[in-house]
């Protein structure tokens, strides 16, 4: 759950979960519905006010790319409104660059730290600036911290999914894609007409899931449509084929990738021991 609280007057902590899109990748950009759920992995930001610093200082060790990204969030927050000087410390358990919503979770945790709980407007401004072209599904799932059905430009609705829907599910890391998400989004948008059928199928998968359809069958159908979009790399395709041959089902979560890795693959109905050793596996049992 998303929460912010002030322990002492000068110390504020806010947490934001990652997200997994069960159905809807890319289709949500074109008005089809999607379903996303929060993950047990999260970003926590601690803010300690200190007037003597005169600025907001980041205390976090990470890759240069992510350090710069988080500093951009802080600088945007400072430019948007009155922010007290102090130190922000970050703790993160969300896998980075893997389609699990880390970039949005950083924004939400940090804006809540700097502006307080009721900062959706400011958080959206930062998200729009740093992640242009986003559909809004990541933001809706992470801000609400609950499973949601999302349709672009509409208020997200909470969706009642079976509590054990991800019981035994695995997240398998196929590696970082060669393409960044904005590049992939642009490429899919440019082919909208030729991709009408797979986009429609992805939208239908959402409705089937809402109607308590067979989750494994829905995942298989969704994966086939994602492959038709061209955002599942050969490496990820091979892995998903192996999983299906073992009786399981799997799909890429998030933007995927044309070449290289495709980020995280969500797998259901298969034991972790059946996954080839070269792939790091995270269990979603919580």
Predicted regions: what they are:
Residues 2-21, 28-29, 36-37, 44-82, ...:
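C-terminal nucleotide
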Residues 32, 107-109, 262:
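Ubiquitous "structural anchor" signal
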């Amino acid at each position: 759950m998303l929460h912010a609280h002030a322990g002492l007057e000068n110390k504020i902590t806010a947490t934001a979960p990652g997200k997994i899109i069960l159905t809807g990748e890319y289709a949500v950009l074109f008005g089809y519905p999607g379903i996303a759920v929060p993950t047990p992995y999260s970003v926590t930001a601690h803010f300690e006010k200190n007037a003597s610093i005169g600025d907001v200082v980041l205390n976090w060790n990470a890759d240069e790319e992510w350090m710069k990204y988080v500093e951009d969030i802080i600088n945007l927050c400072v430019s948007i409104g009155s922010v007290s000087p102090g130190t922000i410390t970050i703790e993160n358990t969300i896998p980075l660059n893997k389609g699990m919503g880390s970039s949005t979770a950083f924004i939400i945790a940090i804006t809540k730290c700097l502006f307080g709980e009721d900062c959706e407007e400011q958080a959206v401004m930062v998200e729009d600036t740093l992640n242009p072209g986003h559909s809004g599904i990541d933001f809706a799932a992470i801000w609400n911290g609950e499973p949601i059905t999302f349709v672009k430009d509409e208020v997200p609705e909470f969706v009642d999914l079976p509590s054990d829907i991800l019981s035994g599910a695995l997240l398998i890391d196929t590696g970082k894609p060669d393409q960044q998400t904005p590049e992939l989004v642009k490429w899919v948008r440019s082919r909208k007409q030729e991709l009408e059928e797979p986009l429609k199928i992805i939208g239908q998968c959402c409705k089937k899931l809402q109607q308590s359809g067979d989750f494994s069958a829905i995942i298989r159908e969704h994966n086939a449509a994602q492959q038709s979009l061209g955002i599942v790399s050969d490496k990820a395709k091979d892995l998903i084929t192996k999983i299906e041959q073992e009786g399981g089902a799997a799909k890429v979560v998030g933007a995927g990738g044309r070449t290289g890795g495709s980020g995280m693959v969500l797998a259901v109905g298969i034991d972790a021991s059946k996954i080839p050793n070269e792939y790091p596996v995270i269990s979603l049992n919580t």
